[in-house]
């Protein structure tokens, strides 16, 4: 599941200058959506590139003032000044609901429901059956029946939970272990907005179970075309990438964060191996190192198996002398990879990072093991022999 952060920035927030400051802070932090009134859509487009959701309105003047496609939101939201926010009483029979009718007729694709009491929970469920996105906001965070909505709505809609802080966002993402798909943040604090985006990123990160494999062979393998993956991010001392010749077993190769007497640290770089090798990607797939180019995403992993995404700035390919490293897993499987013969290339071991030039037969390495083969980088349930 890919989580997202929506930022509330309609006229309830304040005047346009106040809303503009909030939206700008959101753009700088990396929010995914901005929720505004219909009249502000074009203004938001001028500030930057972001998905824009707008409360739908029948105000003809607003529609006439809109200019071209810049004034068209990515999602129309029903519920403000209606039944969804309590301005209009809920009908006894939901078939007579104006908000639900707007969703059914395609006049809106997103529902906004403020949970004022228990009567609004079934209304939110009814909206979720016809809405692409369902925003639920509570007057009091503690009474939002988020667990019930997550359990009953399932995958019928993208469930967006209203929050006022990063701490509330974290709770929303973790509720029932499944969590909300997204949060709608109502805050002017740029730091709180950034923290909420960080919570989103953490919720999306895969946590891998790293294993060990024992070196059975390490030998010079001649020259090959070696790939340095230069990312657009600074990598930490315990971070690197998972690479290898066999997709079923990938080696943990550290980033070049350590100083050397011979070369300066390159904390954005992983000297990943030869062009044929696989590197793991954030979606759980793999790419050949030779395929990587600027703008691609790779998965970065740390010593505890925590992962994050990094964008590739460039892939630098040069002919270099290589080692062939072969290792055996606990179940007797054999995996291997080619790594440059240089003291600056380090791999993860139970005793810490070790230069490939210092490795010996019998040493243990940290690896990531997975079942199945790969076809165009996607896992498939098929017997594939790699040797």
Curated annotation (Swiss-Prot):
Q: Does the keyword Zinc apply?
A: no
Task: Provide the alphabetized UniProt keywords.
Answer: Amino-acid biosynthesis, Aromatic amino acid biosynthesis, NAD, Oxidoreductase
Q: Does the keyword NAD apply?
A: yes
Superkingdom classification of source: Archaea
Q: Which reaction does it catalyse?
A: 2-amino-2,3,7-trideoxy-D-lyxo-hept-6-ulosonate + NAD(+) + H2O = 3-dehydroquinate + NH4(+) + NADH + H(+)
> Secretion signal: which residues?
none
Report the EC number(s), separated by commas if there are several. 1.4.1.24
Task: List GO molecular-function terms, semicolon-separated.
Answer: 3-dehydroquinate synthase activity; dehydroquinate synthase activity; NAD binding
Annotated InterPro entries: DHQ_synth
Record-level GO BP terms: amino acid biosynthetic process; aromatic amino acid family biosynthetic process
Function, as annotated: Catalyzes the oxidative deamination and cyclization of 2-amino-3,7-dideoxy-D-threo-hept-6-ulosonic acid (ADH) to yield 3-dehydroquinate (DHQ), which is fed into the canonical shikimic pathway of aromatic amino acid biosynthesis.
Protein family (similarity comment)? Belongs to the archaeal-type DHQ synthase family.
Question: What name appears for this protein in its UniProt entry?
Answer: 3-dehydroquinate synthase
Q: Which species is this UniProt entry from? A: Halobacterium salinarum (strain ATCC 700922 / JCM 11081 / NRC-1)
List the top taxonomic levels of the source: Archaea, Methanobacteriati, Methanobacteriota, Stenosarchaea group, Halobacteria
């Amino acid at each position: 599941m890919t989580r997202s952060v929506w930022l509330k920035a309609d006229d309830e927030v304040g005047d346009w200058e106040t809303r503009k400051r909030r939206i700008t802070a959101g753009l700088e932090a990396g929010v995914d959506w901005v929720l505004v009134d219909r009249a502000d859509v074009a203004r938001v487009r001028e500030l930057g590139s972001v998905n824009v959701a707008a409360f739908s309105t029948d105000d003809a003047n607003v529609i006439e003032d809109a200019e071209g496609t810049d004034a068209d939101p990515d999602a129309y939201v029903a519920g403000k000044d209606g039944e969804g926010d309590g301005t209009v009483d809920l009908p006894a029979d939901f078939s007579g609901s104006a908000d639900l009718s707007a969703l059914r007729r395609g006049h809106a694709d997103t529902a906004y429901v403020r949970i004022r009491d228990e009567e609004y929970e079934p209304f939110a469920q009814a909206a979720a059956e016809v809405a692409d996105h369902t925003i639920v906001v509570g007057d009091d965070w503690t009474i939002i029946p988020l667990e019930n909505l997550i359990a009953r709505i399932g995958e019928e809609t993208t469930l967006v939970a209203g929050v006022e802080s990063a701490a509330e966002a974290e709770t929303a993402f973790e509720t029932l272990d499944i969590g909300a798909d997204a949060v709608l943040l109502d805050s002017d604090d740029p730091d709180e907005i950034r923290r909420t985006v960080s919570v989103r990123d953490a919720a999306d990160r895969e946590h891998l179970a790293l294993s060990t494999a024992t070196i059975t062979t390490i030998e010079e393998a001649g020259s090959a075309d070696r790939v340095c993956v230069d990312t657009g991010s600074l990598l930490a001392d315990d971070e690197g990438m998972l690479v290898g010749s066999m997709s079923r077993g990938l080696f943990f190769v550290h980033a070049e964060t350590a100083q050397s007497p011979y070369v300066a640290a390159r904390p954005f770089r992983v000297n990943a191996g030869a062009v044929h090798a696989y590197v793991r990607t954030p979606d759980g797939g793999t790419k050949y190192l030779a395929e990587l180019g600027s703008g691609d995403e790779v998965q970065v992993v740390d010593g505890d198996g925590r992962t994050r995404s990094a964008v590739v700035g460039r892939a630098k390919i040069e002919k270099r002398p290589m080692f062939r490293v072969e290792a055996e897993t606990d179940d007797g499987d054999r995996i291997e990879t080619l790594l440059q013969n240089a003291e600056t290339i380090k791999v993860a071991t139970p005793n810490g990072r070790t230069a490939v030039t210092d490795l010996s037969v019998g040493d243990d390495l940290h690896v990531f093991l997975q079942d199945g083969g790969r076809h165009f980088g996607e896992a498939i349930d098929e017997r594939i022999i790699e040797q």
